[in-house]
Amino acid sequence: MAPGTAELEIDETLHLLRMVMQREFIHYLETLPGTKELFIDKCLLRPLDMIATSSDMKRHGVKRIMHFDLQKSPQVWNIEIDQRVFFLRPNVENARKIVEYVEESSENRSICVIWCNRQLEECDLAFESSGVIGHITQLSLNMCLLPLESDLFSLQHVESAQPDLFSVANMFVALQNLYGVIPTVYGLGSESKNLWNLVHALCSSNELRARPDQPISHLFLFDRQLDPVPVLLTGASYEGLLHEFFTIDCGKLAFPVDLRKQVQTGPLDFDWIEINPEEDKEAHQQNRGDTVKLDNCEDIFASIRNKHVTAALEFLHSKAKSIQKSIEKSSMIDDVADYRNFVEKDLRALKKDHKHCELHINACEMMMNKVKMEDYRTMFKLEHEMLLGTVTHEEYFDFVFERVPMRSCRDVVLSMMSLASLKLDGVPDDTYNEFVEMYLQKYGYEHMFELQNLRNSRVIYARRHIAHDRTISERARTWETLARKFRIVKGNEPMDMSNPSDMSYVFGARISPLLCKIVEDTIDHGWNQAEYERIIGKDKVLVEENTYIAADRRPDNRTRKAIMVFVNGGITYWEVAALRLLAIQKNFRILICTTHVIKKREYLEVRAKDASSVFGS
């Protein structure tokens, strides 16, 4: 196979997945008669923007496209609109809001809900209890892998303590229906094994076939809970810090106003969204000019996205000086034709690059100013020493308890307590009791359910809780054993951050992401099934061979086929950067796929509130 051919085939594969979803969505619009008003869930705006264009939707009867807002009353039905269509995530809150829309509409108007990814029984019960289930058409549309980058794909699930295995399994069925069975599949974790069993169950009536031109040679399936440590640590790669500080959403980022003050306002981020003049004007402003697309098409960001933040800043300053010199050279051009040629071809691009440089320099400096603060330096040190096992409990927990009263440090407090719970196989009982008392005094006793939920989610727990749930201790021991096997925790060895030699650079040369080390070990030595079964358990290790090549053999990069790594439950940008370095070092194409990209704050908040709906409205 000629170089580059496999890459084209891979891109086309995932592009076809998107085309299938687009056709299904358009088919739904075609089958709904009359003119339509489309309401879109806020978290689905950007994913839908990558699937169907406004012109596609308007050609199929969509007259208006609106935000779906839980806080606002149903709008008056426009006389020109025959049907309202809602594209929403399935949850009870959205279902209850739909009930309000049905109750406000007249009998001759139709309402359709397209659930992404599937119709849930809880939503049906909400409709049924309100007596409106017969007035609503319900459809479901499974989200495909969306390309956030040429090597990074996401199902754009919302953060959840319970990953949606059904929609993930549907995606793998669609992938293999289009391009044949994946030859070799590895999996670690009970959810990974359950996921692949579900894939086989969904294919039972339509047996998948192998194809020689399948562009993916190996698939790695990982459970997020197998290694929660990268979520809890603060890394140092530029793209990862951008996500933690500002949030990258579907490949786009909204920089704060103070970082954009010297950047000209661009076009509407969603030019197909119509904002009613009666609606909140603030929402209108939020969609104007404050987003930047972050991908490899923008050369400057492509050069720094995976760099350590210090190396990124150094590169940006050097690049800015180089751009400025190129602009100043124009003053030495005497020939009018040459000067006109420079203005037409080079000047605009140079000014654009200079603007991007300035924006990223401002972002780098702002993030580094925070990271260099005494609190952050101490936190990095204590996290590292906790993982090494060299920190004293008194020093570690004194630092945490001093920050409990500081509301701005809530994420730091929860993440450090979670790290201690995992590493120490439960926080000492007296220390845990002291933490609970301080936390409730600061935030109020109505937050006691948050701590209960964090305990039930196995995020923060005391040693006494292990007696009631042995699986908590098993998870901690499994992580500790794998961490020792792959030597993921480093000492204080120096590393050139501008030219890193090891994946640990994403955490300041302190720790390598465990899941990435497992992929590296398989590339170097092959899959060690017996060892994984000994450490994790036979019921949590998956190996499937759909080829004559033995699964325990090392992947061969001479085949020009890709390795797909899928993390169920989300991946961090730290791990993405580490896998990209691994791909370069081993000369493999690695497709990084996931349910969503994790942000530490959302990860902790969701697990703190996961069961609180039981006590809520």
UniProtKB/Swiss-Prot annotation:
**Family matches, as Gene3D superfamilies:** 1.25.40.850, 3.40.50.1910, 3.40.50.2060, Syntaxin Binding Protein 1, Chain A, domain 2 (3.90.830.10)
The way it spans or sits in the membrane comes to: Peripheral membrane protein
One GO term of the cellular component aspect? lysosome
Asked whether the keyword Disulfide bond is assigned, the reply is no
Any one Gene Ontology BP term: cell differentiation
Tell where it localizes.
Early endosome; Late endosome membrane; Lysosome membrane; Cytoplasmic vesicle, Clathrin-coated vesicle
Q: Does the keyword Cytoplasm apply?
A: no
Q: Where are the transmembrane segments?
A: none
Keywords attached to this Swiss-Prot or TrEMBL record, sorted alphabetically, are: Cytoplasmic vesicle, Differentiation, Endosome, Lysosome, Membrane, Spermatogenesis
Pfam families the record matches: Sec1
Q: What is its main location?
A: other
What SUPFAM superfamilies would the database entry show? Sec1/munc18-like (SM) proteins (SSF56815)
Give the knockout phenotype: Hermaphrodites exhibit sperm-specific sterility and only lay unfertilized eggs. In contrast to wild-type animals, mutant males produce no or few spermatids in their gonads, but instead their gonads accumulate terminally arrested spermatocytes that do not bud and contain four haploid nuclei. In some instances, the spermatocytes have small buds that do not form spermatids. Oocytes and unfertilized eggs contain some larger endocytic structures tethered to yolk granules.
Summed up, the tissue specificity of this protein is: Broadly expressed in somatic tissues including the pharynx, intestine, spermatheca, and in coelomocytes. Expressed in the lining of the gut lumen.
Subunit composition and interactions: Probable core component of the class C core vacuole/endosome tethering (CORVET) complex. The common core is composed of the class C Vps proteins vps-11, vps-16 and vps-18, and which further associates with vps-8 and vps-33.2. Interacts with spe-39.
Q: What does this protein do?
A: Plays a role in vesicle-mediated protein trafficking to lysosomal compartments and in membrane docking/fusion reactions of late endosomes/lysosomes. Believed to act as a component of the putative CORVET endosomal tethering complex which is proposed to be involved in the rab-5-to-rab-7 endosome conversion probably implicating sand-1, and via binding SNAREs and SNARE complexes to mediate tethering and docking events during SNARE-mediated membrane fusion. The CORVET complex is proposed to function as a rab-5 effector to mediate early endosome fusion probably in specific endosome subpopulations.
- In which family does this protein belong, per the annotation? Belongs to the STXBP/unc-18/SEC1 family.
Protein name as it appears in the record: Vacuolar protein sorting-associated protein 33B
Gene name per UniProt: vps-33.2
